[in-house]
């Protein structure tokens, strides 16, 4: 640590922060012009450049967000109204006035002091700050860009090599967890591990998959292109406690989103209109939703967009649109599984279902559990449990045991409308033919009478292609497509 800065007249600046700034200013000799030009002309532009050099690790301007960001307590935060950056500019002005007294040449000292005195006028500072937006510009995509970094209260954890280091403003992290990490890799939370055993009813395969899935959610990438559904028909089954604990622990990295984000029925927005929910998901890792009576069907297009890893373009209110690569994993909690009208969600394995069959009876319920799990020492242990889950994920991926996979198979079959239609209204018949158009019309009548979603003709034919085992072949006759080996049942 260098000594505190001492001025020519013997004044010692005992604040380490301001002392370091004075040393930096003195090393730059901003008053020099001509042959020994410092590069900082005696103008608002020059002062904007000098301010940018001194505060580049503390203040940045993002044009897409129309906002300044300032760095404090290990994270970059939006500076609403440019309040904090304006205070930094005031500090800068005071430091420059102190520096004027350090200039050896009398004439230059007087002239430079006269120039710096003008910065006492707020209007001049406003102009300097406006010029500094270019000096300190940052693109929105530069924030939270590293998918392996997790910013804790006391430092940054790197999933690439499982190391922990001091905060670095050059990481440009705007997110931060709600706990301070410990360097003890063996730290654990026994109560959390007991809770996991309880909600999985001692099923080690399910507990292991849950740990790997939650560990995978720490990673800011969409490698697996999937979402997770926690399904429990009973009440008091632990789903909310699990998700709420992870949300609290991850802090800024977690977001509770409306279920309309992934369901049909949500109002379709004009692509040019604001999409604040989507915009708010940039940089998030853990996005949770709860079922709603308003929505009952998953929207395959939305889910494919949000889980596919492709760029998302969104616009917050009163801001310009930004494009970002999703870093989040979707988690849906529900008592009743939502309907799925597009079987491709199952074929592409985008849906992972984890059943919560435990029901905590009144005498088994711990009303203090959520608060207990969210204590600092317990969140540290839970975080390392997730890290160990990430390590397991790196080794074994998201492979599911047969029992876990059977849950998804049952879910798929219960939503297979074409198969249900065939079983109820059709039968195999060797050599029989039916027009594809007539078969689709029969399906529409069946779907409407059963209150089911009516697939488009294109999707219906695609599903029939997937169920090629239900008929002999598909052919054309006089330009009309036919299905061979199938006929309609007689309804009595």
Task: Locate the predicted segments by residue.
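Feature primarily recognizes SF3-like P-loop helicase cores of small DNA viruses
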Residues: 31-67, 94-492
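Modules that initiate DNA replication and primer synthesis
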Residues: 1-34, 66-97
